[in-house]
């Protein structure tokens, strides 16, 4: 098992240098930044915000992008896992930056910073072995090879980086929404909160999410992933008395992630969650 990294900007290089200084525990809280600094962050592109990395486990190589904070001694940082949709699959380790990653990184940098990790699923593969066009699903007994690699990566990062283990989050869109539901069901107690967007889930597994702070989103006229997935899970969670938040955007098709990640209140909720509280 090994992780390889290639810095692509001076900013990232500086961040990486600082992130191995100390592993003592201290939680960094959201902090306001000067206006000029906020403006500079807003202008940054995905290639400036992240580095290319790879992770090897049992002969499987997983490509991923990683944003790293400029770590301070004695500080541990949140970690956000972002799972992309089907359109970003491949082996370029760049397409993952198209949706989601940039607004999450920018928000984190304005509020104390965090590690943000975005693995890339190979072409023709899926985070979850499921036909997306069907109206319902049953959770596979075992994770896909791609999901198993992501799970191993997350354990490795929490063990080797200055990550606050009580502030590990996951969010994803479309295929990555399926993946968000899936990984949280397979790693109970690992994530502090989850935010699947226009994904699908087996509603009979609702009980698996009882102790997980959860918000999920879907467009009411989604033509790619039927909104019925989220509606049924919303009902199943409610019937079981499991606290959660569900937002359905009226007359919105598949892309409901743009408005979701552009909403600072939504991201503030995610980063405010602390496992065990």
Segments predicted by a language model, with ranges:
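A domain-start/cap signature at the N-terminus of enzymes
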Residues: 19-79, 114, 146, 171, ...
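Gly/Ser-rich "nucleophile elbow"/oxyanion-hole loop immediately N-terminal to the catalytic nucleophile
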Residues: 71, 75, 130-173
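The conserved beta1-alpha1 loop
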Residues: 83-84, 218
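Active-site machinery of serine-nucleophile hydrolases
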Residues: 88-147
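Alpha-helical scaffolding within the catalytic cores
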Residues: 98-106, 198-206, 228
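Primarily recognizes the serine-hydrolase "nucleophile elbow" in alpha/beta-hydrolase
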Residues: 158-160, 166-208
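C-terminal catalytic histidine-bearing segment of alpha/beta-hydrolase fold enzymes
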Residues: 213-217, 223-277
